[in-house]
Amino acid sequence: MLFSTVLSHRTLYILTCPNTLIHSYTHPHIHAYLAFTGFLTQLHHLEISCLLLLFFSLSSLLKLMADPDCIFRNGYVDYYNYSFNYATSLSRIYNSHDSFYYPHQTTNPNINENPNLTSPDSPPLREALPLLSLSPIHKHQEPTANHHEYYFMETTETSSNSNFLDQCQDSYRHDVTVDLHLGLPNLGDGGSSSSDVVLDSTDHQEGHHDHHQDQGLEVTMASDHDDEHGGLQRGNHLHHFWIPTPSQILMGPTQFSCPLCFKTFNRYNNMQMHMWGHGSQYRKGPESLRGTQPTAMLKLPCYCCAPGCKNNIDHPRARPLKDFRTLQTHYKRKHGVRPFACRRCGKAFAVKGDWRTHEKNCGKLWYCSCGSDFKHKRSLKDHVKAFGNGHVPCCGIDHEEEEAASDVEQQE
């Protein structure tokens, strides 16, 4: 009480008097107060800040030890309420003592002169702790969404890769379709079921040597339960067949090339015999005739590609031909150009052998003992065989002429 009274009456005098007047004043409370304020002024501002920060840190730690759940009660840390704003505290201290005398300074130290202590720091943003949050449902749902998002992205990426692989496979199948024309041709609305197929592994290995020669060939397979195609109904197993194009039929499916001089041959054996002329080293090993592999494609049954032909696969009673060579002869005779003409009667032929046989026998008549005449020897023989006794060939048909019978008559 006495201290406050003396301070209230003597404040202005004490603040303005010199040191000699202050020291000459002998009141014990005034001396104690002045000693405390002198001690504070002698301390550095940073030391005071450290002491105050340590004090309030200890107080916060004690409060945390008393109630450890207070920090995470709301899912976040309240930095603003539990932090010590030492700048505000220092400003209050200096503002309350700004009228005291400082022996080491000529001006009153104002807190505003320090740029670091001009204004209190803004409170930090409130953010949830990811590991100590008390809302596990929300935190559990978010990874689930991310999981679904990742699964969707992975599914999309997998689908895009699968689409890419499908496109690669489709392009590969397209190439194979262009080269080999896999699958049955379109049978229309009335067509029966069929399945696409490739050659067996054995046939594929046998024809691997002729891979380049067999490009562009069409390989198909149909089931034998096809009632509309009578030639296919031979059991419950599947048969391979081949539908060559007209260019393949006319020019041949194989062109074997010599690796040394690049001369081409229609037959593999002819090419091997040609290579013997290049040296004796080609008579042994894989280059010799011992290792010749037959062309598997040439042994397959073939359908004619000409529309309307009875050997066409679209024909209701279609039958495949024996092999490719038979198909070549059939196509030339029935659907090909006929460049050979008889010099006697002018009849045209597509096969050279048929033309030579016809020209040799052109204009001749074949007679029977009964008086019947025939243009073809085959017809006379059929006549004699049919009527038997009393019917014999006349004009002395020799064996050489019998062997030179026309192949056309045999096919017809």
UniProtKB/Swiss-Prot annotation:
A zinc finger (C2H2-type) spans 256-278, 303-335, 340-362, 366-391. InterPro entries: C2CH-3rd_BIRD-IDD, WIP1/2/3/4/5/6, Znf_C2H2_sf, Znf_C2H2_type. Residues 201-214 have a biased composition (Basic and acidic residues). GO terms for cellular component: nucleus. It is found in: Nucleus. Residues 187-214 are annotated as: Disordered. A motif (Nuclear localization signal) lies at residues 332-335, 375-378. Its main location: nucleus. Keywords: Metal-binding, Nucleus, Repeat, Transcription, Transcription regulation, Zinc, Zinc-finger. GO terms for molecular function: DNA-binding transcription factor activity; zinc ion binding. Probable transcriptional regulator. Belongs to the WIP C2H2-type zinc-finger protein family. This is Zinc finger protein WIP4. It comes from Arabidopsis thaliana. The lineage of its organism: Eukaryota, Viridiplantae, Streptophyta, Embryophyta, Tracheophyta. The gene is WIP4.
